[in-house]
């Protein structure tokens, strides 16, 4: 559990679980005699995170000081500087991923592949207010966004000597973002 005073009453605490599993397949008996296979591991994970990326005082009444003419003099005045957001909740991201780590030829060639699917709900954003309200913006939970993709990393030791080594690497990322819902 995580707590933050930045959120509305009743939403100050969030629970963000995570778990991961890995299976080092290369340690299995049926793969022990394959000399060119250095390592093979399958990974699976799920986790949630919460964001506190808002002003610490967004859910509190704030006053701004000003000056106003009263008669022939100036007086100090105070007025609300922001309108309170309604029921502000944690922006929560849940993600699962599956990955494969592969090392070949005494670990001279390494390949890492990952697929992930991420959903962020209760997105936090400033929202414009009507001018007649007397305020310009307020913070609200505005929607849900999805992000999924595939990432690949290939690394190879081209040259290895005692005092000099040359490693070549290339990566590829295919990512797609989509606004799933606005409210």
Question: What do the PLM-derived regions correspond to, one by one?
Answer:
Residues 1-183:
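Extracellular/periplasmic, surface-exposed regions of secreted and cell-surface proteins
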């Amino acid at each position: 559990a995580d707590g933050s005073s930045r959120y509305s009453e009743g939403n100050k605490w969030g629970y963000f679980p995570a778990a991961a599993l890995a299976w080092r397949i290369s340690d299995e008996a049926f793969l022990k005699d394959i000399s060119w296979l250095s390592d093979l591991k399958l990974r699976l994970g799920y986790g949630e995170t919460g964001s506190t990326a808002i002003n610490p005082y967004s859910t509190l009444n704030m006053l701004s000081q000003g000056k106003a003419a009263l008669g022939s003099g100036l007086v100090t005045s105070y007025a609300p500087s922001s309108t309170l957001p309604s029921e502000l909740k944690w922006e929560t991201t849940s993600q699962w991923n599956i990955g494969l780590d592969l090392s070949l030829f005494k670990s001279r060639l390494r390949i890492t592949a990952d697929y992930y699917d991420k959903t962020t709900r209760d997105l936090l954003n400033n929202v414009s207010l009507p001018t007649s309200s007397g305020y310009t913006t307020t913070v609200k939970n505005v929607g849900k966004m999805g992000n999924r993709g595939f990432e690949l990393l290939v690394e190879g030791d081209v040259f290895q000597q005692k005092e000099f080594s040359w490693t070549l690497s290339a990566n590829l990322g295919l990512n797609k973002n989509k606004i799933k819902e606005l409210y």
